[in-house]
Amino acid sequence: MPARAAVLAVFLFGGTSQEAPPGAGKPPALVTYELAESTKSVTPAGQRTVSALGTVIARDGHARWDLAHGAFPRSSATSVVTGPGGLTLLDAAAKASARATPADFADLFQGRPGVPGSAAPAVRDVSAVVKRDGAGRPFQDWPTARFRLEAAWTVVLSSPGRITRVKTELTGLVESAELAEAQSPLDALQRLLPARDEAREVLGAELSKLTGFPVFAELSITTTSSAETPGVPSGTEPPPRPLTARSTVTRRVRNLAIRAGARGDEALVAIPEDFHERGLDRILVGRAAP
């Protein structure tokens, strides 16, 4: 039986040992849902879309996300397993696993900052606010709460004879449902946002005010880059025109289902036993991990 069909059969009907032995605690509920995340960007260089779509199995704070097709950006990983103890990327074709940090996983979607040395980045003028904004749209049979997010920050890159300022402005809407059984580290919206250093810390602290399980999010990001050349007399040549890029980040949950837990469910959110652990650089594509 194919692995995906086997997982579906276990979810629908449970294992052969669905009842816990006398005196044992009740197994945690098992949750499945479809998760789609995408970032659509329009820049002076053109348009680009990065997306990930697949099925998530969540249990007791742990989760496994299996992509429906393809791999996560900048990697050969087709699945990710995550929980309170950490995060692991899985390459199904190679039967390989690699431990990673949440920042490593975020870098797959956002990319890493430029190599230090040629320019020294500094983050300035950071602000972030998350506010509750009443009730959101119902999600299946559950009510939701709506949150509004506003944030801004500026990254200053200094190099000999040139200063570049990159200002980022972010607005967004998040709808969440009180579904504790579905919650896991995969819910962290911070990994979808291009915030670095102090901006990431401030934004993360503000996003912690979001409650519940985020079933929908839409975030609009505008980035404006301008450059100046200190020491060059004004009027010598016109300054470069500012460059603007716009991105829309979405997260959407569909077809969520919950069933009673059964013995053996923990294997559905665990690293397969026949996978071999490798270094992270063996799964990343296009660059080596430090």
Regions found by a protein language model. Give the residues of each.
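Bacterial Sec-dependent signal peptides at the C-terminal "C-region" and cleavage site
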Residues: 4-27
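Positively charged n-region of N-terminal signal peptides that target proteins for export
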Residues: 1-5, 141
